[in-house]
Amino acid sequence: MGVKSDIWIRNMAKNFNMISPFEEKQVRKGIISYGVSSYGYDIRVSDEFMVFTNINSTVVDPKNFDERNVVNIKGDCIIPPNSFALCRSVEYFKMPRDVLAICVGKSTYARCGIIVNVTPIEPEWEGHITIEISNTTPLPAKIYANEGIAQLIFLGADDNICETSYADKSGKYHGQKGITLPKVDK
């Protein structure tokens, strides 16, 4: 699998609506950067957050998730010490069948003890990316809404495209809008 360049990313965003909204250059002045980079795309975090809380003393169960585990926050977000938040990308993605994207956190946040996790973005998946953020520090951590949070690296198939894409298998997170909580197929 080859890594896709800024030229490929711009072409796919402009001609195939792979990323919307799309920023064709890196925006950096006075903010945490976002937009096209040499071999990736820095995504922004929206102003919607779900921060985990212990006020209801429920168990976090991925098979039976209780929405009382989270508090909704709009705007910049303060994640409590040693806590966790869910959020989403500003951008909506439509992945090509022959491409997989891997997401890595931005070093600006990582150097502050803020760890970003996103599972691979599979071929033909589309939607807003649900982003998981951990504050590993003993201090509150600020996340800036509508600024960069992570970078997507696009990997293209060398030969054959996949037999079954995310859309083909009707993946449970396909077409998600907003923050999507855990789901288990029943």
UniProtKB/Swiss-Prot annotation:
Active site annotation, chain numbering? 132 (proton donor/acceptor)
A Pfam family of this chain: DCD
Q: Which reaction does it catalyse?
A: dCTP + H2O + H(+) = dUTP + NH4(+)
Nucleotide-binding among keywords: yes
Annotated residues for binding of dCTP: 106-111, 151, 166, 176
Top enzyme class of this protein?
hydrolase
CDD domains assigned to the protein according to its UniProt record, in alphabetical order: trimeric_dUTPase (cd07557)
What pathway does the UniProt record associate with this protein? Pyrimidine metabolism; dUMP biosynthesis; dUMP from dCTP (dUTP route): step 1/2
**Entry GO MF terms:** dCTP deaminase activity; nucleotide binding
Q: Which domain of life is it from?
A: Bacteria
Q: Which UniProt keywords apply?
A: Hydrolase, Nucleotide metabolism, Nucleotide-binding
The EC number on file is 3.5.4.13
Matches recorded under NCBIfam families: dCTP_deam
Q: What does this protein do?
A: Catalyzes the deamination of dCTP to dUTP.
Subunit structure of this entry? Homotrimer.
What the entry lists under HAMAP family is as follows: dCTP_deaminase (MF_00146)
Task: Report what the protein is called.
Answer: dCTP deaminase
Gene that encodes it: dcd
